[in-house]
């Protein structure tokens, strides 16, 4: 039974071809939304605060400031509702979790941009 679950998870992971990103990067996540009978794509852009889990259950938490208010949104990375992930800007941080961004707004909520080569590992 455990083998069957592992095989299904591996099959799901092989389908996905996600762009490599890390905590501190600013990414744009496009998701499928069903409004009434219509299906449309909604884009959410924010700074990656945390990546949790692994395998098919891996999640990412994004932080963004809009209209002076901070908001967070979590996404399952391997969900069929996610259309695509695009890295907008690379961030330079020294932490694995950026929860200190929660109460910050304006310039204090910014992450320095990383300029230079980045290794291919996650």
Curated annotation (Swiss-Prot):
Pfam family, one: Ribosomal_L19
Gene3D superfamilies, alphabetized: 2.30.30.790
Entry's Gene Ontology molecular function annotations: structural constituent of ribosome
Record keywords: Ribonucleoprotein, Ribosomal protein
Highest taxon of source: Bacteria
This protein's GO CC annotations: cytosolic large ribosomal subunit
Function per UniProt: This protein is located at the 30S-50S ribosomal subunit interface and may play a role in the structure and function of the aminoacyl-tRNA binding site.
Family: Belongs to the bacterial ribosomal protein bL19 family.
PANTHER family the UniProt entry points to: LARGE RIBOSOMAL SUBUNIT PROTEIN BL19M, RIBOSOMAL PROTEIN L19
Protein known as: Large ribosomal subunit protein bL19
Origin species: Chlamydia felis (strain Fe/C-56) (Chlamydophila felis)
């Amino acid at each position: 039974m455990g083998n069957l679950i592992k095989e299904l998870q591996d099959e799901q992971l092989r389908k996905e071809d996600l762009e490599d990103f890390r905590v501190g990067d600013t990414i744009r996540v496009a998701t499928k939304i069903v409004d009434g009978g219509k299906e449309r794509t909604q884009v959410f852009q924010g700074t990656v605060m945390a990546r949790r889990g692994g395998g098919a259950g891996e999640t990412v938490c994004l932080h963004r400031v809009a209209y002076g208010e901070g908001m967070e949104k979590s996404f399952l990375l391997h969900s069929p509702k996610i259309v695509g992930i695009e890295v907008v800007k690379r961030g330079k941080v020294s932490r694995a979790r950026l929860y200190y961004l929660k109460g910050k707004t304006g310039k204090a909520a910014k992450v320095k941009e990383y300029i230079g080569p980045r290794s291919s590992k996650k």
